[in-house]
């Protein structure tokens, strides 16, 4: 996977197992504990997962501002240096996992490795259009369409025909007019590089499983969650098409039966079924998604009850919210929950995601239960007041929601 999505996968793993998320977006130096006490001892925690299914997730470029008509006709569009979604020859892309129920047991295997001469445009859908990348490769454009023009001065003579060419990328070379920071989009900074024999499989995996924001996110989440312990209680949702804890009765519905329960057996299979079919349509209503997660913990009795009906006041709850960009469809009203806090948490802006994240952390979501959630203090100085304010710690013992937000 690309460097960006390698980080996302690591972050998802860290969030899912209750470890500290890496502070720097491209730092991979921190080791992630695979068996934290929060998951191996005591009551199983709740893990709520919300993924972005907005229309922009179908795009094959990042950041958003790249998609100008000028850039689409330049070499830079086909270089990972300029367009971070494009193929990176320095990364080994991994095929995600298929998780199925076979004879009553969960079986995990790799998805089929795509063929360089017959690669599906969507590796999760075996019926999607197949492309011979050795001769018919086209880069994806500003939306879901593929580029049908060769541009001016982009390719060597005779290589491209109506946008079709052998699979390739363009290598950025740093020089006086081609700076290392804020890379130039000028064609002269990039060198055409066809995909050689040793990179054909790697390119095909990128094309089928990582080419777009949605494909890459699904693959990163797939690889992050397939080893998640069974004693985590999981429910999932999307911004537009599936609500946290909706609990549809059919394992083949929009949510693939996402009733919160331990991440085992058919429930584990249901999650990966849903993940592989995540759609790409609509806006980015992040506030509503966070509110749905918090309200689920506040109002649904299943959030604190095991399947045998036992209810636990010490159960911790975590929410992972992933998105590719800025929110829209903001709720009405003027809410500034963090406006009364000390800096650096205080701000004067109302209706931000931080307001809702603070609200569902500070509010006792189940006042009828005793406050028995175990506080988290990995960093202590001996000064109790300061330790409680340290953002690396969590002093809350009431039922609350801890948010991990992942942005592209």
Regions found by a protein language model. Give the residues of each.
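Bacterial N-terminal signal peptides that target proteins for export
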Residues: 2-14
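P/S/T/G-enriched low-complexity
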Residues: 26-408
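Bacterial N-terminal signal peptides
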Residues: 12-24
């Amino acid at each position: 996977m690309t460097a960006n999505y390698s980080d996302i996968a690591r972050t998802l793993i860290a969030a899912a197992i209750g470890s500290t998320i890496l502070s720097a977006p491209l730092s991979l130096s921190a080791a992630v504990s695979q068996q934290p006490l929060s998951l191996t001892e005591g009551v199983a925690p709740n893990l709520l997962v919300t993924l972005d299914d907005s229309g922009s997730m179908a795009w094959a470029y990042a950041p958003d501002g790249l998609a100008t008509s000028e850039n689409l006709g330049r070499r830079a569009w086909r270089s990972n240096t300029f367009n971070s979604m494009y193929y990176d020859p320095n990364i080994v892309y991994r095929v995600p996992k298929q998780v199925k129920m076979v004879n009553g047991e969960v079986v995990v295997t790799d998805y089929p490795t795509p063929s360089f001469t017959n690669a599906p445009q969507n590796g999760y859908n075996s019926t999607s259009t197949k492309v011979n990348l050795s001769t018919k490769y086209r880069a994806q454009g500003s939306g879901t369409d593929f580029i049908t023009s060769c541009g001016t001065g982009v390719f060597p003579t005779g290589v491209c025909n109506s946008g079709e060419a052998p699979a390739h990328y363009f290598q950025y070379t740093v020089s006086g007019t081609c700076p290392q920071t804020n890379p130039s989009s000028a064609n002269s900074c990039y060198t055409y590089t066809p995909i050689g024999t040793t990179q054909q499989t790697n390119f095909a995996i990128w094309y089928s499983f990582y080419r777009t924001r949605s494909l890459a996110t699904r693959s990163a989440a797939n690889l992050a969650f397939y080893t998640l312990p069974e004693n985590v209680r999981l429910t999932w949702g999307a911004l537009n098409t599936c609500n946290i804890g909706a609990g549809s009765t059919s394992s083949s519905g929009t949510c693939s039966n996402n009733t919160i329960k331990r991440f085992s057996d058919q429930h584990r299979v249901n999650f990966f079924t849903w993940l592989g079919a995540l759609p790409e349509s609509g806006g980015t209503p992040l506030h509503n998604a966070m509110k749905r997660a918090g309200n689920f913990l506040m109002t649904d009795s299943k959030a604190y009850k095991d399947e045998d009906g036992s209810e636990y006041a010490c159960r911790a709850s975590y929410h992972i919210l992933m998105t590719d960009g800025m929110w829209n469809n903001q709720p009405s009203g003027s809410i500034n929950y963090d406006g009364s806090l000390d800096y650096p948490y205080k701000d004067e802006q109302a209706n931000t995601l931080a307001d809702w994240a603070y609200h569902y952390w500070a509010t006792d979501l189940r006042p009828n239960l005793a406050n028995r959630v175990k506080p988290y203090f990995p960093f202590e100085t001996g000064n109790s007041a300061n330790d409680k304010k340290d953002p690396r710690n969590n002093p809350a013992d009431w039922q609350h929601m801890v948010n991990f937000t992942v942005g592209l």
